[in-house]
Amino acid sequence: MRKEKFTVEYILRSNTSQVQIWKYLSSPEGLSSWFADDVTVDKNTYRFCWKEHVQEAKLISIDDYKFCIRFQWLEEEEEYVTYVQFDLKKDDITQDISLIITDFASETEKEDLIDLWNTQIEVLRRITGT
C-alpha cells in the first residue's frame, strides 16, 4: 500500500531554547525518553524499539545549526523511500518554537499516526517543560 508524505506542526512554548529541545530529537538518549522505549545506534543505523516492535532507520541528514534531522526507515517490503524528519523553527516575533514532523502513512493509517504523534508530543512537552 502506497504511503503519502504528510507534515504536522506543534507549537512549543518559548520558555526553552531550540538547543535544549534539539538534544531530545538528535540523540539516542533523548529519543528514547519520548519517541521510543529504547533507541540504540550503530554507526548511522538507529534501532527504535517499542515494546515488541523494532524498526531500524538510517540517519540520512542532520544539521545542528538548522535543527533538522532525517531518518530513513529501512523497510524491506516498501518499494519506495519513507522517512521521518524533525525540524525546529523559532518564530522571530513570538519566540515560540515549532516542531515540524514529516512522516509517511497510507490513507487508512494517517489519522491513527497523527493521533500517535499527538500522544508522543505530549510526552516530549512534559519532559522539556514546553
Short names for language-model regions:
Residues 49-94, 98, 102-106:
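Hydrophobic-ligand binding "helix-grip"
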Residues 1-40:
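Hydrophobic ligand-binding cavity/cleft-lining segments
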Residues 40-47:
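Short coil-to-beta transition motif at edge beta-strands of beta-rich domains
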Residues 102-130:
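A conserved amphipathic terminal alpha-helix motif
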Residues 6-9, 19-20, 96-105, 129:
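Short, charged low-complexity linear motifs
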Residues 21-22, 31, 46, 59, ...:
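Hydrophobic pocket/interface hotspot
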